[in-house]
């Protein structure tokens, strides 16, 4: 297959780091904690997961409900939202960067989930359709995470290698076990809330006859599950309002940590170049360097040195040139000049990290 290894590491490198040192190194990685914290404190967001199924099962009358066929189509369409988010994610990341997309999609998710509140309060006919439309937007935004999560995790591991000189990916899982403890501690919160709003055996027993009258089921059938209390409209509505509130709180908490994620695409590209230089120097020291590695390293160093005293170009003037360009050909040329100017300024920033890496050998500590 035409694949290429993306991990930058010297061919002659042998990992030499103690277990506890590796754990401590990961524990000091701020970016790792930012991403982990976003997941841990956002656990409430998934509370809405049962809304469609509960709405169909417990709030689906003949007068204003939907049939089994339409419900199947609804669930299929909502689930299909994941596809479009995953397709759009790479283009959005390329245009705006991972951090901006992370914040925007998660913040928009909180807004979308809040739209469930007026729907649940109003209880319109065929409410499940309104809920499905809103959840389609939620699934669409959430699916960006399928692409973003592994991309961000890869950047975090490159950053860890940049800090420590070692590729210790396995330690992230070890330190991440803290999340298992947090999950255990928080897993009982949502069931406790359900019980508080009336989804419990006591409420079921006291209102079993009412449920039997609504559903036509026997008392023994009604008593099979405490969730049967959701057939009672006031409990159903109260439960759904609480679910929406918890989901919005979870979604809001989820995106706040991303404001502290400071790994930009530009910085990540610079880190990769620095890692390539380090790999070249290590292979050189071990006598396994080939001609291609030497040429690549020289190109990186020469490019960085040539940009050392370069002045950034005025991007605003290039943008104005695009707006004022007259004719299709002139506008195309102006856009190309703008793109080249942006790339030029980016290379200046990347070169700063590369030059810092090369020039560190001139310092007294070396």
Each predicted region: which residue ranges?
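Acidic, Ser/Thr-rich low-complexity segments on the non-lumenal side of membrane proteins
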Residues: 289-324, 335
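Membrane-embedded alpha-helical bundles of multi-pass transporters/translocases
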Residues: 1-289, 293, 319, 326, ...
């Amino acid at each position: 297959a035409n694949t290429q290894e993306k991990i930058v590491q010297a061919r002659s490198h042998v990992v030499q780091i103690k277990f506890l040192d590796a754990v401590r190194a990961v524990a000091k990685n701020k970016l790792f904690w930012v991403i982990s914290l976003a997941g841990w404190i956002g656990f409430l967001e998934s509370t809405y997961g049962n809304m469609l199924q509960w709405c169909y099962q417990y709030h689906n009358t003949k007068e204003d409900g939907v049939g089994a066929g339409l419900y199947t189509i609804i669930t299929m369409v909502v689930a299909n939202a994941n596809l479009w988010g995953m397709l759009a994610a790479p283009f959005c990341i390329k245009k705006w960067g991972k951090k901006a997309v992370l914040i925007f999609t998660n913040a928009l998710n909180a807004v979308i989930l809040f739209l469930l509140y007026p729907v649940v309060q109003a209880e319109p006919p065929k409410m499940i359709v309104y809920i499905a439309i809103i959840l389609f937007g939620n699934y669409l935004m959430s699916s960006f995470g399928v692409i973003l999560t592994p991309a961000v995790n890869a950047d975090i591991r490159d950053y860890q290698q940049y800090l420590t000189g070692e590729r210790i990916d396995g330690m992230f899982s070890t330190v991440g076990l803290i999340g298992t403890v947090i999950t255990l501690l928080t897993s009982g919160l949502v069931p406790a809330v359900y019980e508080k709003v009336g989804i419990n055996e006591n409420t079921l027993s006291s209102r079993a006859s009412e449920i039997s009258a609504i559903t036509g089921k026997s008392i023994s059938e009604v008593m099979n599950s405490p969730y049967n209390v959701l057939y009672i409209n006031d409990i159903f509505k109260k439960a759904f309002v609480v679910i929406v509130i918890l989901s919005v709180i979870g979604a809001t908490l989820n995106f706040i940590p991303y404001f502290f994620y400071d790994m930009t695409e530009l910085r990540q590209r610079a880190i990769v170049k620095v890692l390539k230089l380090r790999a070249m120097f290590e292979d050189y020291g071990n006598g396994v360097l080939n001609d291609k590695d030497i040429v690549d390293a020289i190109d990186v160093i020469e490019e960085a040195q040539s940009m050392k005293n370069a002045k950034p170009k005025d991007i605003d003037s290039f943008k104005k040139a695009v707006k004022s360009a007259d004719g299709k050909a002139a506008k195309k040329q102006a856009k190309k000049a703008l793109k080249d100017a942006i790339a030029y300024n980016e290379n200046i920033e990347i070169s700063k990290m590369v030059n810092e890496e090369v020039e560190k050998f001139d310092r007294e500590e070396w």
